[in-house]
Amino acid sequence: MGFSKIALFSLFALFGLPTSLAKSSEEWRDRIIYQVITDRFAVDSDNTPDCSFDDSSYCGGTWSGIRSKLDYIQGMGFNAIWISPVEKNLEGSYGSDGEAYHGYWNTDFTQLNEHFGSEDDLIDLITDMHNRDMWIMFDALANSMAIPGPTDNISYSNLVPFNDSSYFHPYCWIDYGSNNNTDIEDCWTGDDNVILADLDIESTNVADYLHEHIHDMVERYQIDGIRIDAVKQMNPEFFPNYTSAAGVFAIGEMFSYDPNVSCSVRNYLDSITSYPIRQGIEFAFNYTGAAFEYLQEIDTQFQQACEGQDMSVIGNFLENHDLPRYTSITNDTSQDIGAIVFLLLHTGIPIIYYGEEQRLPGGSDTPENRAALWNYGYDTDANYYQTIRTAIALRKQAISDSDSWTTDSHSYLDYDLRHAVVRKGDVLGVYTNYESSSDNVTYDVSSNFDDGTVLREVLSNTTTTVGSSGALHVTVVSGLPQVYYPEASLTSFGNFLGTATSYSSASASYPSTSMSASLSSVHTSSATSSSKSSSSSSSRSGSSSSSSSRSGSTSSSGSSHTITSTSQSVHTSGSSTSTSSVAVTSTAYSSSSSSSSSSSIESSANAVRVSILGVAAFIAIVLFI
């Protein structure tokens, strides 16, 4: 790193100030995350290295490559990026497991992974992101370290700083079917090619180092949030001090489809990734099992299991680096698009895995679900890219119109095997699992909007008027989702869309000119309007208490269904959690909390101090040079 960057970071540290203001759970609610596998997303040159579909070696993606594609990511509306772990990893190739291109075989907490670029490259990426008001999320590793197999030849000598067996739990293979938490938390993962030795995080020496490490990483690289890997395999008592040391929003990977198991760590973390909701979405849109009835049921169970906790910051996703690409589950584009749109407009923080916008193919296992995106291109006119862009723009519109939209309850107005009608605030979605080749299906929806309200279906860019008693006549074309929003509230939609482009042709497409092709020109004249709409909240139906009853009047035969409101409301805002600040002494971290008003005052004060120190830093550097 050049002197100027080190000097600036050091000057902030000298005054005891963070290099970036800590981002809380409340601030992360408004974010939409794009997850990348650093090695597979983009290269930093015009060259496109060979990287086969099932390649398990490094392919050449870098931090500079991500930086070169920020326009591409931001063009969809994403304002946060989750990157692969950055620490140095195990070198070499290990049988069928290949190389550590994914970043999860860490061996040295003191060095960066040089395959992804230099420290300057990483800082330049983050600096450019922050200049765009995009936030960075680091993947934090604290559960294990990688050792070459086999197990009868274990050596810790190359691990930094934990180069002795005393820093690890005794060797034993984890039994995922065990009900013994100690077995799951203390035993090891991996295989005879690469062993992931389980760190003894109950040890004071180990825990203190990990606290210091994550604190220093956040300070040095201006990290806005962390995703903690493998929290199911860790003692949850470790997390409060660890996240306090980080001082930023922390979301944990809780790999369990059981709502009760998933929610068991919510008292220790700001958030978790929602595997139960992901499974519900898969079953519903792929027409598997109970379909939308199962999605509604698992959604309700998840809310109940996490009762009293803030569900508005749950991380919702359809794909990730550990799961099959959805294209391997269904080859139907309408089902796929419906699942993505549902995810983007649901309660929680949406997370889209790189390549979903290009409908990246992928197998049911790694590395087939981690293909190099440059082999498929970065087409900003692609149907999926534009659909994601439109749905994100609507999400931002809804948040702009109502301070409470992210924490509003969502209601399943009706649901059965083949469809669901979901309302959250003023966003009304009609979703089905009909295939793209299916006939049109008509529904009469009880929308809970006032009579005479003009609604725009944002994906096809058409309007309709609400009839008597809130009735809405909906025709689902080729199985595609329908998403409605009050026309009068779309004044700044073009601003959220940004530069407009139209849908390209695809096997499943919308019947008329796309929202992104026209609304930006229709509404740009009033795009600067960002006031909160009081009329929006007055027409909401999502604040009523939960009801276990559902309509029995839906028909599953024929092409016409009459839907009556069941007001199946799912509450989302429990006891809101805030990220604790961290006070650093020579040996310990102490957490403290403050009210939202004092946090606001402190943030303002920090902003002033940072501005002053920024000027001071510049002067100091110039004088030094």
UniProtKB/Swiss-Prot annotation:
What does it catalyze? Endohydrolysis of (1->4)-alpha-D-glucosidic linkages in polysaccharides containing three or more (1->4)-alpha-linked D-glucose units
Name under which the protein is recorded? Alpha-amylase 1
Family note: Belongs to the glycosyl hydrolase 13 family.
Origin, by domain of life? Eukaryota
Region annotated Disordered, chain positions:
526-579
Residues the entry annotates as binding Ca(2+) 2? D229, E253
Its EC number(s):
3.2.1.1
Q: Does the keyword Membrane apply?
A: yes
- Report the InterPro entries cross-referenced here: A_amylase_C_dom, Glyco_hydro_13_cat_dom, Glyco_hydro_b, Glycoside_hydrolase_SF
Q: Give the species this sequence originates from.
A: Schizosaccharomyces pombe (strain 972 / ATCC 24843)
BP GO annotations: carbohydrate catabolic process
List, in alphabetical order, the Gene Ontology terms for molecular function in this entry. alpha-amylase activity; calcium ion binding
State the Gene3D superfamilies in the record: Glycosidases, Golgi alpha-mannosidase II
Kindly list the cysteine pairs connected by disulfide bridges. C51-C59, C172-C187, C263-C306
Catalytic residues per the record? D229, E253
Could you say which residues bind substrate here? W105, R227, K232, Q233, D322, R370
Q: What class of enzyme is it?
A: hydrolase
Instruction: Say where the lipid (GPI-anchor amidated serine) is covalently attached.
Output: S603
Keywords of this entry: Calcium, Carbohydrate metabolism, Cell membrane, Disulfide bond, Glycoprotein, Glycosidase, GPI-anchor, Hydrolase, Lipoprotein, Membrane, Metal-binding, Signal
Give cofactor(s), names only: Ca(2+)
Q: List the Pfam families hit by this protein, alphabetically.
A: A_amylase_dom_C, Alpha-amylase
